[in-house]
Amino acid sequence: MMTMTTMADGLEAQDSSKSAFMEFGQQSHSQQSSPSMAASHYPLHCLHSGSHHHHQHDSSPYSGSNSYNRSLPYSYVSHPHHSPYLPSYHSNASGTQTRLDATEQQKTTVIENGEIRFNGKGKKIRKPRTIYSSLQLQALNHRFQQTQYLALPERAELAASLGLTQTQVKIWFQNKRSKFKKLLKQGGNPHETDTLPGSIALSPRSPAIPPIWDVSASSKGVNMSANSYMPGYSHWYSSPHQDAMQR
């Protein structure tokens, strides 16, 4: 009986020591795992705190910019499509277009009302040359021989009598004066150019033109033979009657 009791006590002692050893092992394992958990928890906490701190730093420029915007004397517009330079550019473009339109209108006015006309490219276009009749040229030349310069009432009266505009009379007198001075410089006679084409009127200094044939004799009733028209050529021709007599 003593032997069985001793063996049972020995087994209990071994169990108690084994259980104590297991508890100690569990405690040591728990102590070893707790620092790793603490270490793992610390980086997470640091990461969380760092992210929170970083978030604060990220949000700080906005707050700083807001405070900076409040300190500026003008409002800062951060949108790229609403730049303050764009309205001025559009206003300048519209101003340039307005000036171009005004220039085109001015050119049109010059074309309609002015003496010197302009086309779309800005080049001068000469007005069509005025064609004067023989009667108008005769009256203008006669008036030019009297005076080379006309007053406004005289020019208006002459233009109305000839059916011309005052501008046409003015331009004709200007051209006539330039031709007159040019002929004087060359030493010619300016009055030789006063003859009118298709007109019988002659200048006083022009020599008399001899008549081609004299018709006064026929008007007086003087009989002229047919051979008198060709006196030197009658022997070239012979009549058929004379040819028969000679044969």
Curated annotation (Swiss-Prot):
Name the SMART domains on file.
Answer: HOX
Gene3D superfamilies per record: Homeodomain-like
Q: Does the keyword Nucleus apply?
A: yes
Q: Where in this protein does the record put region Disordered? A: 22-66
Write the record's keywords in alphabetical order, separated by commas. Developmental protein, DNA-binding, Homeobox, Nucleus
The residue ranges flagged as biased composition, category Low complexity, are 26-49
Highest taxon above the source species: Eukaryota
The residues that make up the annotated DNA-binding region are 125-184
One GO term describing the cellular component? nucleus
Q: Which family does it belong to?
A: Belongs to the distal-less homeobox family.
Its name, as the record gives it, is Homeobox protein Dlx6a
Organism of provenance: Danio rerio (Zebrafish)
